[in-house]
Amino acid sequence: MKIVISKPDKNKIRQKRHRRVRGKLSGTADRPRLNVFRSNTGIYAQVIDDVAGVTLASASTLDKEVSKGTKTEQAVVVGKLVAERAVAKGISEVVFDRGGYLYHGRVKALADAARENGLKF
């Protein structure tokens, strides 16, 4: 008899963690939410006003300014871009939503770059 132990799906666990955090976290017009999504090939960041349901600023590895480098280096550039675009629209304070990901690696690099370029969280 063969016993198979199924491994939990990492993305499903992340989504569950994200839903749990999102129940307590919301962005307003005064202090919007900086959301991060990480895929295998890229990283995406949006500044969202949850009350109006509007994206105020965004940046990703699909932008022309972000092309070369490692994934962590690209995350730094995305953090810089999203912060510059948010500050240009008069947004200085945000709520950081790590999307259920660990605050480490690419997510941390993006957050640090956003802080260095004028966003407070």
From Swiss-Prot:
Q: Which InterPro entries match?
A: Ribosomal_uL18_bac-type, Ribosomal_uL18_bac/euk
Provide this UniProt record's keywords sorted from A to Z. Answer: Ribonucleoprotein, Ribosomal protein, RNA-binding, rRNA-binding
An example Gene Ontology biological process: translation
Gene3D superfamilies the record matches: 3.30.420.100
Gene Ontology CC: one annotated term: cytosolic large ribosomal subunit
* Highest taxon of the lineage: Bacteria
Q: Which residues form a coiled coil?
A: none
Record's keyword annotation contains Transferase:
no
Q: Name one Pfam family in it.
A: Ribosomal_L18p
MF terms in GO: 5S rRNA binding; structural constituent of ribosome
Q: NCBIfam families, alphabetically?
A: L18_bact
Q: Which family does it belong to?
A: Belongs to the universal ribosomal protein uL18 family.
What is said about its interaction partners and assembly?
Part of the 50S ribosomal subunit; part of the 5S rRNA/L5/L18/L25 subcomplex. Contacts the 5S and 23S rRNAs.
Q: What does this protein do?
A: This is one of the proteins that bind and probably mediate the attachment of the 5S RNA into the large ribosomal subunit, where it forms part of the central protuberance.
What is the protein name for this chain? Large ribosomal subunit protein uL18
* Species of provenance: Streptococcus equi subsp. zooepidemicus (strain MGCS10565)
Gene it is expressed from = rplR
